[in-house]
Amino acid sequence: MSIVSSVAFVPRGYASEFPKSYDIDEIEYERINQLSKLKLEDARADLQSSMEDSNKANGNGEETTDGAEGVLQTSEEVDDELKVYNLDTYDDDEEEAETEGPAAMFSNIRGLAYHENGEKDPYITIDPQEQDDLEREEMQILPTDSLLLAARTEDNLSHVEVYVYEPTEENLYVHHDFLLPTFPLCLEWLDYKVGTSDNAPGNYVAVGTFDPEIEIWDLDIIDAVYPAAVLGAGASQVNKKKKKSKKINDSYHTDAVLALSSNRNAHNLLVSGSADTTLKLWDLSTCNCVKSFTYHSDKVSCLDWYSKAPSVLLSGSYDKTAKIADLRLEEAPSSFQVTSDVENVAWDQHSENNFFIGTDNGIVYYCDARNLSKSVWQLQAHDGPISCLSVNPSVPSFVATGSTDRVVKLWNTSDSSPKMVVSRDLDVGRVFTCSFTTDESTAFHLAASGSKGVVRVWDTATNPGVRKAFESRVTEEVTKKERIVQLEDRGAGEDSSDDDDYEDIEDDDDQDAEMS
């Protein structure tokens, strides 16, 4: 069983052309040593907790007497087993002759050919330099390549896959990956070199999981064993020592990290939302928490910085509110109330003051930050919870939504009566995540994935309905056949034979979305 819980595109121009292999020097060794100590302390805390639970269950530490307990062997029984397998005479065996047994294979060692250093072996036909060049070429990331990140869990093993997407070749493949300690919930790409104060550009990803820590990985390093940084390091160990009281604090989260958002104006700032109901602002130059906020009364599920004002943040929560806060001010944030848990929030990047809200009951709200007494419009977008909502950064009024009803829908929100352009089952199972690319040249490309564990990239410009709705923005020549790219031979995680059939809405049959 394999599922993908989150996907994210990396803008072109940030990835290294030739990613480096993981190298352990003295500095890295010392850093790993410190991280390992934290992991060891976590393991000790787990062991101590298990022993305490066992003692409580048994009553004052006494052993249980049910039939499941093991029976100790007597010394006579142990001796009998040694005799059966001749283990008592194991050290007394005579050495075998050189011409008999395993040693015989080395008896003709004098006849083996030996080549001096630098001398060519006639049986090795591949030039080492040629082999190195071939391997280097295979790892090369071209300027025309796009990187796509996918958080995958398969058979209780979680990792982040770094895909290379070649739009012109219609090719998608895994370039490298790295393991995670637990189930991933969200990904956020970072353009800041973590741990430095020189504001240098970087290529990193922050990962939120069921653990309270946030791991940050360098995407330009292959076969990395440990993350480049851990925000809130040691929080798990503290929580395990004080399980009964997960007290909220100003330094780290005490529960799962559900949402992350990087500030594209102040590049060293990252904000996180957690099941502990708090938001935390992190300084990536020091990897420390700058400030903690308690705007919500339930789990914080989604976040989005306002691109036109670096200090303004939009957040959504299971307390059925979306809130707008200026993090520089102490005053209470503005709030918009909805009828169900908030699953997604996103600013409309092409409108000055508007934003979207996606909820657990399938409704999408479009709001104006200047008037939160009512929404501009709202629509019943899906039959199930809206698990993902992506606003196209390059094409105005182009929005994608996905749901556990297994459908991805594309919307034209150019006026007060939004229209559904396409409704498509991409055969990814229950849709958990979708995201438009951030590059202008591939503006119509949408990645989606879900409960089947299959990652698909859909060139929506090849759909007739999309071309008609956004004809002024479709500049490239497109084929009549729709293009949906996926990783070949990837096993599906579940049977989709009972999926409903959905048809595109094309030509003159654009249908108005159901308005509430």
From Swiss-Prot:
Subcellular location: Cytoplasm; Nucleus, Nucleolus
Listed Acidic residues bias regions: 495-516
Xref: InterPro entries: G-protein_beta_WD-40_rep, PWP1, WD40/YVTN_repeat-like_dom_sf, WD40_repeat_CS, WD40_repeat_dom_sf, WD40_rpt
GO cellular component, one term: nucleus
Region (Disordered): 46-74, 482-516
UniProt WD repeat ranges: 182-227, 252-292, 295-335, 337-377, 381-421, 426-468
Amino acid composition bias (Polar residues), ranges on this chain: 47-62
A GO biological-process term: rRNA processing
Keywords attached to this entry: Cytoplasm, Nucleus, Phosphoprotein, Repeat, WD repeat
The protein's name: Uncharacterized WD repeat-containing protein C17D11.16
Organism: Schizosaccharomyces pombe (strain 972 / ATCC 24843)
